[in-house]
Structure formats: C-alpha cells, structure tokens
Amino acid sequence: MRPSRRPRFRNILENRTIAAMTRSTIASFRAVSKHYGSHCALRDFNLELREGELLTLLGPSGCGKTTVLRLLAGLEIPDSGEIFLDGRTLAGVPPEARNVNTVFQSYALFPHLSVAENVAFGLRMKKLGSAEIRARTAEALRMVRLDGLGGHRPLQLSGGQQQRVALARALVNRPRVLLLDECLSALDYQLRREMQLELKGLQRQTGITFVFVTHDREEALSMSDRIAVMRTGRIEQLGPPRDIYERPANLFVAQFAGESNVLEATVTAITAPDSLIVELAGTPLTVRTDRRFRVGARLVLVLRPEDLHVHDDAAAEGGLAGHVLERTYRGVTLDTVIALDAGPRIKTSEFFREDTPALDHPPGQRVRVSWTPGWEIVLPHDPET
C-alpha cells in the first residue's frame, strides 16, 4: 500500500468509507445477464447498492452502465438472474410500481407545462390530494433552489436550472433509489462542477441512494461514496474513490481512473516481502508492492503525472534520466513531456509557482524524474490492456 500523501485527508475519507460500509443493502443484482441481439451488455453481473450511498458506475461507452439503470428501473427485463429492491424480487414488477426514479441526460421536461407542473406531474399520476401535491412540490423546489420559479416554463430557464427541475421532479416522489444517467454531460465545464457539488449536497440532505452513471473519472472520483468500474458488462473493481485511484485492481482500472504513465519492467530480485528490484530498459529500480511476483516476471509500473518531480541534474542517482520534449502551462500546473533514456515518454504535472525557478525546464534540457518511494503502482503485465 502506498504511503499517504495527506494523512488527515486519508482519515476523513476512510471514516466516510467505514460509515458507508456499515449501511444495509437496499437493492441487489444477482448473476444478471442481458443481451441485445448478439451483443452481451451484462454478463453474470453482481452488485449490491447500500442504503443512502452515492454509487457511481464508471466505464467506457458500451460497457453496460446504462443497462444496469434500465434494468433496475424496469425499462428492460434481464435474460437471466434476479434483481431485488428492499429484499423483494422485481421480477414482474412494472416500472411505475418500483419506487425508482430516473433523471436522463435530456431532462425530458414537458415544454408546455410550468416548472411546478413538471415537478408535480408524478404526484398527479398517483392521484394524491391537491394540498399534498402543492406542499411536496414547494418542498422539492426549495430543495433545488428554484422556489420562486414555479410559474416559469422550462424554455425560460438556463441549462442548470432545467437540470434542477428534472431533479426536483424525481425527488418529489421520494424514491428509494434515484438513477442519474449521465445527466451532467450536456452542461458546460463550470456549470457541471457546480452541479456536482449540488448533487452531493442533495444526496446527503435526502439520504436517498443515488446511482450515477458517467464516463468522466473526475465526476466519479469527486462525487462518489463508492465507484464500480465497468468493462464489457462486468465490474472490474468496486470500492471507495481513493482505492480505485491509488490501489487499482488492474491496468484497465488504473488507466481509466486517472492519467497514467505505464512503464513495462522485469523483476530481477525480491529484496523483502514488499520490495522488488526491477529492470526498466537496462535501468534498475527499487519498487514497493504488496503483490507477489517471481524473479523474471513481467510487470508494469503506473506513475501518476502529479506524483513525479523533475530535477535539473540528469546525472544524479535514482529515478529515470531523459530530456524535455514539451512544456505546457495550464495556470495551476506545468505539464512536461519527457523522453526517457530508457525508451518511453512520460508526462509530469507539477504545481506552478512563479518563484520556483526549478520548474523551468526548456525543451531539450537533460533532466531526471523521481517520485516518493512507494507511490508507484505495481501491477501484473496485462497483454489485453
């Protein structure tokens, strides 16, 4: 396990994770499979959703994320396996009887109805009393900070406000599970960041289980109690964001969870239960890992760009020598592409400070790249990734 960069922050995250792990199961998928023609969208899929958590399904297009939502919502029927909600099978239960609501990417608002009428639509379909409908609609609009806009039409609102209307329309039904299908992808960057914070706040405030689908790793890492990384209809890894990012189960998860430098190496010696000497294109390196390897085994080192440091003295010991190919100023960070003498190119990302001349490495300069021992991620060689 890699040493913590921020022990206090680590404790906060771990306390939150422990709290999430003690929650009871609200819904579960058991050996669920789903095909669309010859395409297998889900295969022997297993997942438990916990009461009051925000779970994100993260993965590339076509990996089965949206199929999971559609099956839970009752919009699709599994080919095999069972889905349970509150301990009861959902087999044969129609969508309207499941107490599960979905917020879609398109929002699906009725343009001819007012904001309040859109929010109240589901309650009217349930034939609730008018007083209860008014009270619950007003409560939902306050929750998403749209009180005072109930008389407006959707087209009079901004994209972010329309998103809040869609959320209010789902929350007003007080669902057991709220499904969010890439519902932030149509927003611009700044508004998307704001809505991420609002969604987290709403989830904490209501205590409703949220299942969020995205292919955006920053959204997943910043919002979730747990993340399920999916590939070809299966979960590759399920766990808290920090585990997904810092302790990935395999190379696919490592690369999908964050920007990665991937270096192939061979084990030349085992010096301790958690320490190896590896050879990278003729360069010996000592690495730390709790995984077991034999001498001669091929493996990969995953180095996060933000974990790397660039030094002027290419002749110094330790790390990897090379020369600068490109520098990119990004305001907060300086990104550097370096061609290593060992062969591959790697990228570093360092926080930029104008009073730090050590960060000024022009193209062509000889440098050495280092990192804190133990911050490398050591994984088995995966020919499929």
Curated annotation (Swiss-Prot):
EC supergroup of this enzyme: translocase
Gene Ontology terms: cellular component: ATP-binding cassette (ABC) transporter complex
EC code(s) of this entry: 7.6.2.11
Entry superkingdom: Bacteria
Catalysed reactions, as listed in the record: ATP + H2O + polyamine-[polyamine-binding protein]Side 1 = ADP + phosphate + polyamineSide 2 + [polyamine-binding protein]Side 1
Localization per Swiss-Prot or TrEMBL: Cell inner membrane
List of residues binding ATP: 59-66
Domain ABC transporter span(s) in chain numbering: 27-257
Keywords recorded for this protein, A-Z: ATP-binding, Cell inner membrane, Cell membrane, Membrane, Nucleotide-binding, Translocase, Transport
Topology in the lipid bilayer: Peripheral membrane protein
Example of a GO MF term: ATP hydrolysis activity
UniProt-listed SMART domains: AAA (SM00382)
Coiled-coil segments: none
Family annotation (Pfam families): ABC_tran, TOBE_2
Function: Part of the ABC transporter complex PotABCD involved in spermidine/putrescine import. Responsible for energy coupling to the transport system.
PANTHER family: SPERMIDINE/PUTRESCINE IMPORT ATP-BINDING PROTEIN POTA, SPERMIDINE_PUTRESCINE IMPORT ATP-BINDING PROTEIN POTA
Family statement: Belongs to the ABC transporter superfamily. Spermidine/putrescine importer (TC 3.A.1.11.1) family.
Subunit-level organization: The complex is composed of two ATP-binding proteins (PotA), two transmembrane proteins (PotB and PotC) and a solute-binding protein (PotD).
Name of the featured protein: Spermidine/putrescine import ATP-binding protein PotA
